Every structure is written in C-alpha cells, then in structure tokens.
Amino acid sequence: MGAVTARRCVEWLLGLYFVSHIPITMFIDLQALLPPELYPQEFSNLLRWYSKEFKDPLMQEPPVWFKSFLFCELVFQLPFFPIAAYAFFKGSCRWIRIPAIIYAVHTITTLIPILYTILFEDFSKAIAFKGQRPENFRERLTLVGVYAPYLIIPLILLLFMLRNPYYKFEEKRKKK
C-alpha cells in the first residue's frame, strides 16, 4: 500500500469519526448539560438505557467538572466536527493540521480525568455519584471501552498530524 493510499485510509477513518461524533454529541452527550425539554422522549430513553446498561455515573449524575467538559464539547468541538469531516473526506487539506492538533490535544486531555475516574474512583464512598455505577473491574473496563475510542482516535489524529510528511510540509508561497 502506497503512502498516498495509507494517508487516504487514515483520512477516511478520521472523517467517519467526526461524522459519527456529531449525532452522539448532539443527542446523547449534551443531554447531561442542556435542559431536558430540548430532547424528545426517545433520546431521553436512549440516554437512560445507556446509563443503566453501562452503569455510567458520569452521564447519570454528571459532576460539575464533567459538565465543564461537555460545555467545551458544545462550544468548541461540535462546530469543529463538520469542518474536520469535510477536510478529511476531501483529503489533502493541509489547513486542518493546526485545528486538528488543538482538537486532539484538548480531547485527550479531557479523557484522562474521565478514564481515571472510571477506573479508580471509589463510587461506594463518592457522594457525587448517586446513580448506578460500575461495581467490579469488569464493569469498569466495559465502561472504559465506551470512552476509549475518544482517546484512541484523537491520539491517532495527533500522531498523524505531527508525523505524516504530507501534513508536516508547509508550502511556501511565491512572492510576486
């Protein structure tokens, strides 16, 4: 597989990631931040099912720090998703490099406390988490599996933007 083909495969993966992230953010994640009357009952039921099935305490009773991440997702990330999807599906858009690096670093940074909380929080003693919560290590790993793609794909994006020779190269404009 040639370098161009490999680059296009990664760009398509990233494009699919950003397209899929739009409805997940709008219809699931932001329910923990926005007023409930904005959402039809079907979406509320979907969130309730997810929260109970995966025992996600962050989505059942979101702590303030988690809501701050959701606010950033609404204000900064959601507007970026269609732009990034366009750039990666179109391909060869060098202008996406810096915004993609900023997005990747921001997302990776927010996932670290989320994953740390899921793995190490003593939910039995934590007063901030009142709903269902993971009770054993297997349930914690299942929940980590839900969040892990939002760490892994941005990490791939970051490395791709930093290491791929096509995106590292800056074209110098000719002076007239």
Curated annotation (Swiss-Prot):
**One record GO biological process:** regulation of intracellular cholesterol transport
Per UniProt, subcellular location reads as: Rough endoplasmic reticulum membrane; Nucleus membrane
The main location class comes to: endoplasmic reticulum
- How does this protein lie in the membrane? Multi-pass membrane protein
Residues that span the membrane, as ranges? 10-30, 69-89, 100-120, 141-161
Site (Likely important for receptor folding): which residue positions? 56
Instruction: Provide Lumenal-side residue ranges.
Output: 31-68, 121-140
Q: Which InterPro entries match?
A: EXPERA (IPR033118), Sigma-2_receptor-like (IPR051987), Sigma2_recept (IPR016964)
Q: Can you provide one Gene Ontology molecular function annotated for this UniProt record?
A: oxysterol binding
Keyword line: Endoplasmic reticulum, Membrane, Nucleus, Transmembrane, Transmembrane helix
Record's GO cellular component terms: endoplasmic reticulum; lysosome; nuclear membrane; plasma membrane; rough endoplasmic reticulum; rough endoplasmic reticulum membrane
| Binding residues for cholesterol | 75, 77
Site positions per UniProt: Important for 20(S)-OHC binding and stereoselectivity: 150
Q: What domain comment accompanies this record?
A: The EXPERA domain doesn't possess any sterol isomerase catalytic activity. The four transmembrane helices are all kinked owing to the presence of proline residues in each, creating a ligand-binding cavity near the center of the protein.
General function of this protein: Sigma-2 receptor which contributes to ameliorate dysfunctional cellular processes and slow degenerative progression by regulating cell functions including cholesterol biosynthesis/trafficking, membrane trafficking, autophagy, lipid membrane-bound protein trafficking, and receptor stabilization at the cell surface. Forms a ternary complex with PGRMC1 receptor and low density lipoprotein receptor/LDLR at the plasma membrane, which increases LDLR-mediated LDL cholesterol internalization.
Under PANTHER family, the record lists: SIGMA INTRACELLULAR RECEPTOR 2 (PTHR31204:SF1)
Remarks, miscellaneous:
Sigma receptors are classified into two subtypes (Sigma-1 and Sigma-2) based on their different pharmacological profile. Sigma-2 receptors are identified by radioligand-binding studies as a binding site with high affinity for di-o-tolylguanidine (DTG) and haloperidol.
Family to which this protein belongs:
Belongs to the TMEM97/sigma-2 receptor family.
The protein in question is named Sigma intracellular receptor 2
Q: Which species is listed as the source?
A: Rattus norvegicus (Rat)
